[in-house]
UniProtKB/Swiss-Prot annotation:
Protein name as annotated: Regulatory protein ViaA
Cited CDD domains: VWA_YIEM_type
Protein family (similarity comment): Belongs to the ViaA family.
Gene this chain is encoded by: viaA
Species annotation: Salmonella schwarzengrund (strain CVM19633)
Subcellular location field: Cytoplasm
HAMAP family: ViaA
Domain of life according to the entry: Bacteria
InterPro entries, A to Z: Uncharacterised_CoxE, Uncharacterised_ViaA, VWF_A, vWFA_dom_sf
UniProtKB keywords: Chaperone, Cytoplasm
């Protein structure tokens, strides 16, 4: 079976130009122009996808098969090229019959060339083959364009669906260009409008709770790079020029304000002997506002001091993945559930912006896992947001799942985040011991996001940092009032 790629090679038809024209026409379509104006961050993400589009189009052209009629005509043309003029004249009736049977666009022109010339010369033989080849090139080009047009319609349909999805989720999940690119990659999945509206809903809830978003950003970016003074830093010599009054008597050329007691004017010195003005004298002395004689000329000297070298080493703090455990017990239902889900969505936003992983585990009696930053992150986020918090509380299982996950090499610098009201039983000693070991030896950090002011101190004591977001009615009213 003859492929279109082989036919293009045989007839020297360049598909590259046609592919580029199709890509340019796609980018110039009104739908994309309006989308790029509305969401400029996603423009770079879509543009970065162009090489993949080109490769997909080339692959489609390469794998496409030529229709049997065109393939038969091409094979006949190739065989005819090998014939001499006398041999071609002998085969001409069969060639004309073949072109007529295949309904070739060249059939009528070939018949006209033959009938209008009584003598079939070598020049006519060459002209016949040239026009035949030109007809085949036109047919091959038309076939390429038809396939590209079909692909363009399909590609435009897919891009429009992804643009709709990405445009809806961009305000919630795309903080920067990196996040926009990852969001565009995730949008390649098969999603319906009703599915991702759940993310939009929680995004709107998150926007209405700016303190929750701020808390997520503080937690997510709490491991910033910091400068650490170099230990045992050597001393370095530091030289400065200091201006001082001349120490030898010189010609007086005026009065100035200073703290030079040796050059005090008599009226200033007299105030020192008056009890009521003594403190005023000392104040002016400290502020260098006493009236003194100004000598002609000033003396400069070089002051030499030593101080530690101020160079610092930058201790870049690793920023690894998030392992987020969410309490799905009955006490976490209602507003707590909304806040916990919205907080995870905010952490997903931070993870996409900083190119980090975000792994969610739900704990009640069983542990359910979701990865929100993978290629199927949007589907995973929708499944997570669809969960209902109606189970029991088994925080020990949560910590054991975190500990198990942190044993893997790809999670060696992960941060653990536990979202709960921490109204639960105490942790077993072996779990507390293992968490402490991970904190000491591997610098893993454990964060608690407390949704209640009544969490048990015995449980929360093991965390490196406790982020409080009280969901009680009083705190909610206070936050609303402050806005």
């Amino acid at each position: 079976m003859l492929t279109l790629d082989t036919l293009n090679t045989m007839l020297a038809v360049s598909e590259e130009g046609m592919v580029e024209e199709m890509i340019l026409a796609l980018l110039a379509s009104p739908q994309l122009v309006i989308f790029f104006e509305k969401f400029p961050r996603l423009k770079n993400a879509v543009t970065a996808d162009l090489p993949r589009w080109r490769e997909a189009l080339r692959s489609r052209l390469k794998d496409a098969h030529v229709p049997p009629e065109l393939m038969e005509e091409v094979m006949c043309y190739q065989q005819s090229q090998l014939l001499s003029t006398p041999q071609f004249i002998v085969q001409l009736p069969q060639i004309l019959a073949l072109l007529h049977r295949l309904h070739s666009p060249y059939a009528a022109q070939a018949k006209q060339l033959t009938e209008s010339n009584s003598t079939f010369t070598p020049a006519l033989h060459t002209l016949f083959l040239q026009r035949w080849r030109l007809s085949l090139v036109v047919q091959a080009t038309t076939l390429n364009q038809q396939l590209l047009e079909e692909e363009r319609e399909q590609l435009l349909s897919d891009v429009q669906e992804r643009m709709t999805l990405s445009g809806q989720l961009e305000p919630t999940l795309a903080e920067n260009d990196n996040a926009a690119g990852r969001l565009w990659d995730m949008s390649a999945g098969q999603l319906k409008r009703g599915d991702y509206q759940l993310i939009v809903k929680y995004g709107e809830f998150l926007a209405a709770q700016p303190e929750l978003m701020q808390l997520a950003e503080q937690l997510g970016r709490s491991r910033e790079a910091k400068s650490v003074p170099k230990k045992d830093a050597p001393m370095e010599t530091f030289r400065t020029l200091v201006r001082e009054p001349a120490t030898v008597p010189e010609q007086v050329d005026g009065i100035q304000q200073s703290d030079d007691i040796l050059r005090l004017l008599p009226p200033e010195l007299a105030t020192l002997g008056i009890t009521e003005l003594e403190y005023e004298f000392y104040r002016r002395l400290v502020e260098k506002q006493l009236l003194t004689y100004r000598l002609h000329g000033e003396a400069w000297r070089e002051k030499v001091t030593e101080r530690p070298v101020v160079h610092q080493d930058v201790d870049e703090q690793p920023r690894g993945p998030f392992i987020v455990c969410v309490d799905t017990s009955g006490s976490m239902g209602g507003f707590n559930e909304q806040c916990a889900k919205a907080f995870c969505l905010a952490l997903m936003r931070v993870a996409l912006a900083d190119n980090r992983r975000c792994f969610i585990m739900l704990f009640s009696t069983d542990v359910v896992r979701y990865e929100l930053s993978g290629p199927e992150g949007i589907e995973q986020a929708i499944r997570f947001l669809s969960q209902r918090f109606r189970g029991g509380t088994d925080i020990a299982s949560c910590f054991r799942a975190i500990i198990e996950r942190m044993q893997g090499r790809e999670w060696f610098d992960a941060d653990a985040v536990v979202i709960s009201d921490f109204i639960a039983q105490r942790l077993p000693d072996d779990v507390v011991s293992k968490v402490g070991e991970l904190q000491r030896l591997h610098q893993h950090r454990f964060h608690a996001v407390a949704m209640s002011a009544h969490g048990k101190p015995g449980i929360m004591r093991i965390f490196d940092h406790i982020w409080r977001f009280d969901t009680g009615m009083r705190s909610r009213l206070l936050r609303r009032w402050r806005r």
